[in-house]
């Protein structure tokens, strides 16, 4: 199959994928806050660098899981990393 980066993802496919993840891993609707995850990815990609978005999302999940994994802890981890990326200084000039 094609790599994900070679495909475009219509909004309904995003919902379908999220539903599949929720079912596979027995997650509730609040366990996978799509809008906050996408915000994190966008802010990190723009504020830090595009390649840092996937592992920043992974880090948010890891932090949330180690903190107990409640929906509130998921939101807190996402918000913390999003805030860090939003305040990240532009390092493109310092070479």
PLM region spans:
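Long, acidic, intrinsically disordered low-complexity segments
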Residues: 1-25
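C-terminal binding/interaction regions
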Residues: 5-7, 21-22, 69-95
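S-adenosylmethionine-dependent methyltransferases
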Residues: 16, 23, 27, 39, ...
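Amphipathic, hydrophobic secondary-structure cores in small proteins
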Residues: 29, 34-67
